[in-house]
Swiss-Prot record:
Source organism of the structure: Koribacter versatilis (strain Ellin345)
Keywords (A to Z) from UniProt: Ribonucleoprotein, Ribosomal protein
Record family assignment: Belongs to the universal ribosomal protein uS10 family.
GO BP, one annotated term: translation
Biological role stated in the UniProt entry: Involved in the binding of tRNA to the ribosomes.
Protein name: Small ribosomal subunit protein uS10
InterPro entries the UniProt entry points to: Ribosomal_uS10, Ribosomal_uS10_CS, Ribosomal_uS10_dom, Ribosomal_uS10_dom_sf
A Pfam family reported for this protein in Swiss-Prot or TrEMBL: Ribosomal_S10
């Protein structure tokens, strides 16, 4: 890949430890192939809260509250080489990590 191209990678996971491990693997792989990295940038954590009745029939006052947090990271790989793209495609990330990859060409700023 030639020019001012970049790859933007967004990672999402419920467990921040697995997310940080996956981010580290991607950063190490990209640096080994000679690409420049911008990030990892931690994005705001989304907290979803759910309230459930404890009793199946009565007692509206008795409730159970649950919370699930979605942690996010953003990585930009600047001026990736073909070797970088091949290494990222072969990378095996743990389950539970959602990876979204977008490639931008010269026209995007």
């Amino acid at each position: 890949m030639i020019g001012k191209e970049r790859i933007r990678i967004r990672l999402k996971a419920y467990d921040y430890r697995v997310l940080d491990q996956s981010t580290g693997e991607i950063v190490d792989t990209a640096r080994r192939t000679g690409a420049q990295i911008a990030g990892p940038i931690p994005l705001p954590t989304v907290k979803n809260k759910y309230c459930v009745l404890r009793s199946p029939h009565v007692d509206k006052k008795s409730r159970e509250a649950f919370e699930i947090r979605t942690h996010k990271r953003l990585l930009d790989i600047l001026e990736p080489t073909q070797q970088t793209v091949d290494a990222l495609m072969k990378l095996d990330l743990p389950a539970g990590v959602d990876v979204e990859i977008k490639a931008f060409g010269k026209e995007h700023k």
